[in-house]
Amino acid sequence: MIGYLRGRLHLVTPEGILLETGGIGWLVRTVTNRSWPAPGTEIAVYTQLVVREDAMELYGFTRPEELHLFTLLRGVNGIGPRGALQILGAAKPEQLSRAIAAGDSAFLTALPGIGAKKAQRLLLELKDAVLKSGLVDGTETEAIPAGGGDNDEALAALLALGYSREEIGPILARVRQELGNAAPTTAVLQAVLKTFGRGGGD
C-alpha cells in the first residue's frame, strides 16, 4: 500500500498532479481547487490506492485529516472515491467534521452530490466515527443549534462554514425576505454563499 509520497511536482493536471519521485512519475488525483506551488517544488502527499476492476487510481491529500475523511466517506454506501474527492473539494476537513458531528444535514445537502437521503445516510454511518476519530471536539457541536425550522438549519450550516452570527444575521434576513419563508434551506444557503462570493450550486 502506498501511503505517502514526497517528490518534485512535475505537472498540475485537470484531475490532479504528476509527482516525480525516484525517476518515476506518479499520477495522483487530488481536489481540483487546490492551489499548488510552481512545478519543480518538492511536495508531499498522503495517498490511498483505489483498485477497481478496470483501473488503479492513486488519490492524494496534503493533510492526513483529509485522507482520513476520504476513507470514511468512501465507506458510505453510494459515495465512491471521486464523489468523496468532490465533497472534500467543497468543504474543509474541520467544517465537514463539525457538520457530521453536529448532525447538520443542511450543511451536507449544500455540498455537491449530496441529497437529503444521502446526507442522512452519511450522518448515520459517520457521526460516531468522526467523534471517535478526534477530528472534532465534541464540545464544538454545542455551538450549532439543534434546529427545527429552516432558519435554524440555514444558520447552523453557515456557522459550520465558519461565519459569525454578526456576518450571517443581516444577509440571512435579507435573503429570507427575498425568497420567502417557504424557501428550502438549500436555496437559502446558495443565495447567502453567493453574496459572500463562494457560490452555490448542486
Curated annotation (Swiss-Prot):
GO terms for molecular function: ATP binding; four-way junction DNA binding; four-way junction helicase activity. Keywords: Cytoplasm, DNA damage, DNA recombination, DNA repair, DNA-binding. Residues 1-62 are annotated as: Domain I. Residues 63-141 are annotated as: Domain II. InterPro entries: DNA_helicase_Holl-junc_RuvA_I (IPR013849), Hlx-hairpin-Hlx_DNA-bd_motif (IPR003583), NA-bd_OB-fold (IPR012340), RuvA (IPR000085), RuvA_2-like (IPR010994), RuvA_C (IPR011114). It is found in: Cytoplasm. The RuvA-RuvB-RuvC complex processes Holliday junction (HJ) DNA during genetic recombination and DNA repair, while the RuvA-RuvB complex plays an important role in the rescue of blocked DNA replication forks via replication fork reversal (RFR). RuvA specifically binds to HJ cruciform DNA, conferring on it an open structure. The RuvB hexamer acts as an ATP-dependent pump, pulling dsDNA into and through the RuvAB complex. HJ branch migration allows RuvC to scan DNA until it finds its consensus sequence, where it cleaves and resolves the cruciform DNA. Belongs to the RuvA family. Homotetramer. Forms an RuvA(8)-RuvB(12)-Holliday junction (HJ) complex. HJ DNA is sandwiched between 2 RuvA tetramers; dsDNA enters through RuvA and exits via RuvB. An RuvB hexamer assembles on each DNA strand where it exits the tetramer. Each RuvB hexamer is contacted by two RuvA subunits (via domain III) on 2 adjacent RuvB subunits; this complex drives branch migration. In the full resolvosome a probable DNA-RuvA(4)-RuvB(12)-RuvC(2) complex forms which resolves the HJ. This is Holliday junction branch migration complex subunit RuvA. It comes from Moorella thermoacetica (strain ATCC 39073 / JCM 9320).
